[in-house]
Every structure is written in structure tokens, then in C-alpha cells.
């Protein structure tokens, strides 16, 4: 009887361990219970990573492909550099064995898609790009935990810190920090299945070197199903954001954009505007006028709508249609007057009051929808005030948030500014990176041993029952039915940087 009970118990234990997605474990009587081997899933229905949301949610990037390790901060294209890894073709995941500033010698362009850039894998303080724009011209791209702080040292007279506007699809940019552009910091339009989420977009350079003169713009946003959520835009003179509309496609029926849970601080001039053609949701965004905003008539505007001038591909007069709900204007900045606060409270009571029709080309009623547009999944929608706290806690390259982003978050929370420009800008608007002390130092740290260069540290592989001498197990589905073993490791580093349900 004892032998029978032991056999039943042993069988039950073996079946339990074999069905678990966890690591290989010692079995009763010695030996090892083999790892579970899940079949490769259909990635078209699996989020890019836990926390991915919006139109680009199901981007697969380089999942299951080669692992390329960046070991050098040089930008000469040699093996081991970021440019070398980006130029490669085929599915690939780019991980980092170094931290610091990469001083780009020319624009960094992704021409070959099916790629994941996992900035969170960098040891120490992480990666920061300098001098030139980071441009995406490919399909199926995931970029996470990268900083692009361009500056004006390279004398680029009208460049963005990061952009993608070449009619591509399946792109998600997550937890990145963008600043010090000479044009816009973050410009993304005319792409489909696109998400920009959990990013800090701050301090574009105003009186710098743009060929048209003063700039300092946040970004141009849009897309044929695009989502922009949980981003912080801070300290820009304008374009927070400009909505591109269907100016270049001539297809307003295809322009569909979701903007939710964004935080916009210390904006100026027109603030958010344009949208010449398309359908737009503005849901639960948090507007916080700062000292610069208090000097502008835009302090009480959620959006200023434009009609198309007919100079590109739209018919003249085309305009967007907008749905507003749950957006909140924070009246706590000490620079605001009582009258300004009263105006803002009217917008909080009725968001449609915050829509301005430029030139009065049509009655406001023609621009308003009474129900939200069905655009993309929106599983992380929060009330505006909760989103404010979440964005300040988690946005940007926050695996190790640098001193620059810490300052921006602090200013946003307190409704203050710390610096003025060296060429005439003021109230938190800057002209050169040196106005705020320049680039922070990004220290590296000891790189965990990774004998097979598969992106997973040896110690982590052993802990999870993988083989630190077998590079092929990075692409296996042993620890999860949805994500490769490498993805489980990379996601595990940063899963805490999203609101916990």
C-alpha cells in the first residue's frame, strides 16, 4: 500500500512540475524534471510586452530572432556598436553590455524592421543618444528605455530627437526620454498600428539654430490608427502636440488617433492644435499650465482646430472631428490669475469649452462627436488625476531615471521652472543644453556574465533551469506560453514600471 501511495504521489508531483512554466527542478529520487516546451505562439494576438497598449500593442519586433549585443559606445558601425546592430537584417533583439552616451556621427536610421531595442538591459545608468536624430523607417519595431537628447552641437538646423513618419506599420515606443531637439522632440505620423507610450518629451530648444528662427516644439502626431498615452510633454513653446491630420495622405477617413492619459505641462502659444482631417479621441488627459503658459492665451485650450489650406493632398477646408471627455486642467500653478483659474474650471466642467475653432471656419458642433471613436484597444485608461501620478512615477527611461528627467518630473509636480534660456527664452523654456547644465553622466556597471551571449545572464539562466552555454534557448518558449525566454528576462526587469492592477 505504501508503494502504491508513493507511486501516486510521485506521479502527481512529476505531472505538476512538468506542466509548470517555471524552471527545471530536482525530481524525487534524483534527476531533473525537464522544462516545459510550449509551442511557438501566434504573435499577432500577444502584446509586445506586458504593459503594451494601443494601436501598436501587438507589435512583435525581433522576438525569436538573433541576439545582438552592443558592447561599445562608438558610432563607427563596427561590430558591437548600436549602428552595426541596427543595420543588420532579419528578426533580432538588441541588448546592451555597456552604458553611457553614444555620440552619433550622423542620423541613426532603422531601415530594417523586425527588431527590438531593449535599452533596459544596459548595465548602470543606461543609454543616451546625442547629436543627431533617431529615425524609424521600417515595420515591426519595438524601442524601449532609450534616451535621445540631441542638442545642437552637430549644427543640425531642424531635426527631431526621435521620429517616424514614413508610412510604416507596427511600431511601439515605450519608456523613452526625448529632449533638446532643434525642431520637434517627438514626431510620429502617417504610420499605422503605432503606439507612443510612457515617454518623457521635454525642453525642445527654442532660440537655437533652426533655420526658421525660434522653435522649441513638442511634436507632430497622427496616424492611420495611432495611440499616444501616458506621455509627459513639458516645457515647449508649441506643438504639444500638433496633430498632422490627413494633409499628406489625403484620406481623412483613415486618420484615427487616440490620445489618452497624457500629461502636458508648461505649454505655450497654440498648445495642441491643427488636425486637418481625421477622427480624434481626447480622453482623460491632464493639462497643467505652468509659468510660461500663464503668459499665453492658450492656457484654457484643450485644442485649437484648423481647416486644411489645400496646399498638400487634402481638399481645402477638410477638418477633423473630435471627442473630448475626462480631460482635466490643473489650476494650482502660482503664476495663474484668479480669472485664469475660473476659465480652466469651466473647461473641467465641460471639455468642449476647451475646443477653439481657428478662423471660425465651421460651427463648433460640426467638429464634435458625441461618442468616442473606436480606434484601438485602451486597456490602461485611468482617470486624469490617477494618470498624472502614474506618469510622474513611471514615464521616461525610468529603469534608472537620470537627474534630468527627475528635474522635469519635479517641476511638473510643483508647477515651477528651474532654468531660463541663454538667448532670450524664459520661464522654463531653454535655448541650449548648457542652459540646464548639459548632458548628465551615465555610469556603467559590472556586466553580468553571459557565457553564450544570448542576452540572459548566466545566473538568471541557471535560476530558471536554462543552459548558460546554449545560446539557442533565448528563442525558446520554456518559461512562458506567450514570450520567449529572453523576453521573459527583459520584461521582468521593468514590469514594475507600469501601474499595478
In which residue ranges do the predicted regions lie?
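Bacterial N-terminal signal peptides
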Residues: 7-16
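Detector for repetitive beta-architecture
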Residues: 67, 91-93, 99-101, 107, ...
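Extracellular calcium-associated, cysteine-rich motifs in secreted modular proteins
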Residues: 434-501
